[in-house]
């Protein structure tokens, strides 16, 4: 019993050596002014700290951005429990400048801007979706395009080009080129 006395007094002296916060490095659990909380998203000191119902601490700007980027599936970034704006609790402590709810001052969302696509005339090559190029596949005696009807892409044909335009000239060139290739293949099959 007597041997426990000196060690107990030594530990009391060590805990009081850090000053009024109760810790020598300022990060103790005693709740000193130097103690900080870390956000579980940015891993920095939590600014406008909020705590989820599952017990995880976040900066409100970080959590707000997390929730805005996943509007259909709002889960806790740590444990994947359900989370929303209403399921977080603002955390106030010593040294906080204002007692305003951090959920009320959400960062402003930037306005979406959609520039109009530039209209490029003429044949754009074989880039799918770029120049209106479309392929239709058929099997044997069914050239109407089984794949096109199965995937519901058969109605996306652009109107025919107006004669005299560069697009019309390109289409005629490709038509003649494919006809020539088909004739060469048929001739090769006949002589083989």
From Swiss-Prot:
Q: Where is the composition biased (Low complexity)?
A: 14-27
Q: Which PROSITE patterns match?
A: ZF_RING_1, ZF_RING_2
GO process terms (BP) = autophagy; defense response to virus; ERAD pathway; innate immune response; positive regulation of ERAD pathway; positive regulation of type I interferon-mediated signaling pathway; protein autoubiquitination; protein K27-linked ubiquitination
**Ranges in the Cytoplasmic compartment?**
1-130
Quote the subcellular location field of this record: Mitochondrion outer membrane; Endoplasmic reticulum membrane
Q: What is its EC number?
A: 2.3.2.27
User: Which catalysed reactions does the entry list for this protein?
Assistant: S-ubiquitinyl-[E2 ubiquitin-conjugating enzyme]-L-cysteine + [acceptor protein]-L-lysine = [E2 ubiquitin-conjugating enzyme]-L-cysteine + N(6)-ubiquitinyl-[acceptor protein]-L-lysine
Single GO MF annotation: ubiquitin binding
User: Where are the RING-type-classified zinc fingers?
Assistant: 39-80
Its membrane topology, per UniProt? Multi-pass membrane protein
Can you tell me where the transmembrane regions are?
131-151, 172-192
- Please tell me in which tissues this protein is expressed: Ubiquitously expressed with high expression in testis.
* Region feature (Disordered): 1-30, 90-123
Residues assigned to the Mitochondrial intermembrane compartment are 152-171
Per UniProt, which keywords does this protein have? Answer: Autophagy, Endoplasmic reticulum, Immunity, Innate immunity, Membrane, Metal-binding, Mitochondrion, Mitochondrion outer membrane, Transferase, Transmembrane, Transmembrane helix, Ubl conjugation pathway, Zinc, Zinc-finger
Give the enzyme's main class according to its UniProt record, as a single word: transferase
Pathway annotation from the record: Protein modification; protein ubiquitination
One Pfam family linked to the record: zf-C3HC4
- Copy the domain comment: The RING-type zinc finger domain is responsible for E3 ubiquitin ligase activity.
The name this protein carries in UniProt is E3 ubiquitin-protein ligase RNF185
Q: Which gene encodes it?
A: Rnf185
């Amino acid at each position: 019993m007597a041997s426990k006395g000196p060690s107990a007094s030594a530990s009391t002296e060590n805990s009081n050596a850090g000053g009024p916060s109760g810790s020598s490095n300022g990060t103790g659990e005693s709740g000193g002014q130097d103690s900080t909380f870390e956000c579980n998203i940015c891993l920095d000191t939590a600014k406008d700290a909020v705590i989820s119902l599952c017990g995880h601490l976040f900066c409100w700007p970080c959590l707000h951005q997390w929730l805005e980027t996943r509007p259909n599936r709002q889960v806790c970034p740590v444990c994947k429990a359900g989370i929303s704006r209403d399921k977080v609790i603002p955390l106030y402590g010593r040294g906080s400048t204002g007692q305003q709810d951090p959920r009320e001052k959400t960062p402003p969302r930037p306005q979406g801007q959609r520039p109009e696509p530039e209209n490029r005339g003429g044949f754009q090559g074989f880039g799918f979706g770029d120049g209106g190029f479309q392929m239709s596949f058929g099997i044997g005696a069914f050239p109407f395009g089984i794949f096109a009807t199965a995937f519901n892409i058969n109605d996306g044909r652009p109107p025919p080009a107006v004669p005299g335009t560069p697009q019309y000239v390109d289409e005629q060139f490709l038509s003649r080129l494919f006809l020539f290739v088909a004739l060469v293949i048929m001739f090769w099959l006949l002589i083989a």
